[in-house]
Structures are given as structure tokens and as C-alpha cells.
Design a protein with these regions (language model features):
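Auxiliary, metal-adjacent structural segments of Zn-dependent hydrolase domains
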Residues: 59-121, 129
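Polar/charged alpha-helical tracts
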Residues: 29, 48, 79, 83, ...
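Non-catalytic architectural context of zinc metalloproteases
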Residues: 25-74, 103-106, 173-186, 219, ...
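A general structural signal for short secondary-structure junctions and capping/turn motifs
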Residues: 3-7, 93, 195-196
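Classical Sec-dependent N-terminal signal peptides that target proteins to the secretory pathway
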Residues: 1-26
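Hydrophobic, Leu/Ile/Phe/Ala-enriched alpha-helical segments that form helix-helix packing faces
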Residues: 16-17, 81-92, 144, 148, ...
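Active-site-flanking segments in enzyme catalytic domains
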Residues: 97-245
Length: 245
């Protein structure tokens, strides 16, 4: 009788562990980011949202830093973020390896502020909810493209992309090596949507993708941009033929 009773207790404990939502260490085991708690896990496209309950540092040199936000700021930005990310179906997100969204503020890498940090290996996107409101929605999709690009490097060939530009144009070797940081959309594009588009090929692709998602097209009188938009559309359709811009 005692044996059966102990077995029953173990069974109840096992069931409790299985149905209890992930917290603290369990979240860390999932995505290797400390100090997180659940914000929302019951979403239309099954994305799981976490928030920083206290500041965290990441990376081998601990040079990725993000701070915790207050509840009002989280609540205000969550609806906006969720609205934008609901543009992506669960099927598409699964194909590009994105499952987790981390919300925090004052995100930086080696002292350089950034809107987001994508990690397709950990299926995670960290977003700075205090990033400039003027660009915030658009940069969400910019960061989504980096997840896509990292998951499908073979589709987004940078040499092919570079060939669309004027022959005398050269990108920087890295986005942080460039002083071209402006995010305002040009009135007169000449092959590039923003100053930041001119930093690297991958940033240029991300800017074109984010503008397409945000329903901003400047390619009518710009043959270079027309080629770039077609390239993005065609290769996204190879990932998911049902994807709609």
C-alpha cells in the first residue's frame, strides 16, 4: 500500500512538472538568455513572448546588454509588436526558425545601440521596445529578414544582390564599420531606400524587405530597386509560396 502511495505521489509530481509553464531556469534552458519571465505564450501564430525581469548580459565577452522594462511600457508595446508579427503565419515562422520574442530596452552590442538581435539557432529575436518610435514597426520586419537570411543563405546571394547596383558602388565590410546609419526613407532613391541600406548587402536586403512588408514601394521610377524588390519577393516565395507582402 505504501509503495502504491509513493508511486502515485511521483506520478502526480511528474504531471505537475509537465503542465507547469516554463519560468526562470526553464526559459534559460530554451534560449540561453537569463532573467526572463513569460509575458504571453498563447498567440495566434504560436510565438512565445518573454520579458526581462532584470537586466541581462550575453555573449562570450558579455557585450550584449539589455535592460528590463516597466509593465506599462511592456503592455503598450506588446500590442504593437504582436500586430506586426501576426503578419507571419505559424507555418512561415516554423520554416525560418523563429519561436521566441524577448522584450527589453536599451539593447546594445559592444556599446552600440540596436533595435534587435536575431538568432536563428536559438529561434529567438530580442527587441528593444524603446527603440525610436518613428521606425519601430518597420525595424521589426527588418530584424525578421535577418532571421530569414540566416536560415536561407543560399537563396539570398550577396554577389547577385550587389550586381544590381551601379558598378562604382561598394558596401562596407560590416554594418558597424559604416557611418551610414540613417533610417529615413529617401524621396529620391537611386537604388537605395535609406542611408542604412548602403551599409552592407544584408542590411540593404533587410531594408527592402521591411519596406515591402510596410507597403512602401519606391521602385516605380527606380530600375535598381525594381530588381531588388523582385529578388526579395521571388526568394521569399521559394520559402513559402503562400507568403503575402
Amino acid at each position: 500500500m505504501i509503495i502504491h502511495y509513493m508511486y502515485l505521489l511521483r506520478l502526480i509530481l511528474l504531471v505537475f512538472i509537465c503542465i507547469t509553464p516554463v519560468h526562470g531556469n526553464s526559459i534559460y534552458n530554451l534560449i540561453k538568455i537569463p532573467n526572463l519571465e513569460i509575458y504571453e505564450i498563447n498567440t495566434e501564430n504560436r510565438l512565445k513572448y518573454f520579458y526581462a525581469k532584470s537586466s541581462f548580459r550575453l555573449g562570450v565577452q558579455k557585450n550584449i546588454i539589455c535592460e528590463n522594462s516597466n509593465k506599462d511600457d511592456l503592455d503598450n508595446k506588446y500590442n504593437l509588436i504582436n500586430k506586426n508579427l501576426n503578419k507571419y503565419s505559424h507555418n512561415f515562422l516554423k520554416k525560418i526558425s523563429l519561436k521566441y520574442i524577448v522584450l527589453c530596452e536599451n539593447l546594445s552590442i559592444a556599446g552600440i545601440n540596436t533595435a534587435g538581435i536575431p538568432d536563428n539557432v536559438m529561434k529567438t529575436l530580442i527587441l528593444d521596445i524603446k527603440f525610436d518610435h518613428k521606425y519601430f514597426e518597420r525595424v521589426i520586419h527588418h530584424e525578421i529578414f535577418h532571421i530569414i537570411n540566416d536560415s536561407y543563405k543560399e537563396l539570398f546571394n550577396e554577389e547577385k544582390w550587389t550586381s544590381f547596383n551601379n558598378k562604382n558602388f561598394k558596401y562596407s565590410t560590416c554594418s558597424t564599420c559604416s557611418k551610414k546609419l540613417g533610417l529615413d526613407t529617401y524621396k529620391h532613391t537611386n537604388g537605395f531606400l535609406t542611408e542604412y541600406s548602403q551599409s552592407t548587402a544584408s542590411e540593404d536586403m533587410a531594408e527592402v524587405f521591411s519596406h515591402l512588408i510596410y507597403k512602401i514601394s519606391k521602385s516605380k521610377n527606380d530600375p535598381i530597386l525594381k530588381k531588388k524588390e523582385t529578388f526579395i519577393r521571388n526568394n521569399i516565395s521559394k520559402i513559402d509560396k503562400n507568403f503575402k507582402f
